[in-house]
Structure formats: C-alpha cells, structure tokens
C-alpha cells in the first residue's frame, strides 16, 4: 500500500493512496482533516481489538472506518443500501468507495500521516 502526503497552497495536508486503496486517502482527506484526536481514537481501538474477536466502527460524514483485530475496511457511506436495491448483475464494489487493508499497514499510514502533519 503506497501513499503520498502533500500540502496544497493553503497548507492543508492531502493524502494520495495507491490503486485499490484510494478510499483510505479519501478517509484521511474528508474525515481526519488533520484531527489527530481522531487518529488517537483509531489507534486506541486497534490496540484494544488485538487478539480479540470484537470489531470497532467509526462512522463519519462521508466514510465509515471498520476494523477488527486483523483488517481495516473503509467504505463510503453511500454504499449503505439493501441488497434488493442492487440491479441484477451489478456489483456495488468500486475502488473509490471501498477499501480493505491489514491493521498493521493502516497503522503505519496513520503514524506517517501524524508525523507529516506535525512537521508544519
């Protein structure tokens, strides 16, 4: 999972992720927006889940982050619909709307993002 952190002309941090993980970048850009307290909450949840069968979820305005002890899923909230609403043969998966990755990989991106934000 490759990523890049940039600052726009106003100094706002933007995250770009490799193909297949774009929605993780959108989560940082739309939900985190340099809110390090949210990252603290996510890291604490990840540590609490380690070795357990439980899961944790944080719904945001545009994206929801879900994780268990091994995997993180970020999905666009617009994907919430009943299976009956899906047309025959249509797959709702869209790499811009859903992404899965390992917890350790995700926490590495969180740590790198935190370091980048603090370098102002």
Swiss-Prot record:
It comes from the Bacteria. Belongs to the UPF0231 family. This is UPF0231 protein YacL. The lineage of its organism: Bacteria, Pseudomonadati, Pseudomonadota, Gammaproteobacteria, Enterobacterales.
């Amino acid at each position: 999972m490759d990523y890049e952190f940039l600052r726009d002309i106003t100094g706002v941090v933007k995250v770009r992720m490799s193909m297949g993980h774009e929605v993780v970048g959108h989560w940082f850009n739309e939900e985190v927006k340099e809110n390090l307290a949210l990252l603290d909450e996510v890291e604490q949840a990840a540590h609490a889940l380690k070795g357990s069968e439980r899961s944790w979820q944080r719904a945001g305005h545009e994206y929801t982050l879900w994780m268990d002890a091994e995997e993180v899923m970020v999905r666009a909230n617009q994907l919430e619909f009943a299976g009956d609403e899906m047309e025959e043969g249509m797959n709702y998966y869209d790499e811009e709307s859903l992404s899965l990755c390992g917890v350790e990989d995700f926490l590495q991106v969180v740590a790198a993002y935190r370091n980048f934000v603090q370098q102002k």
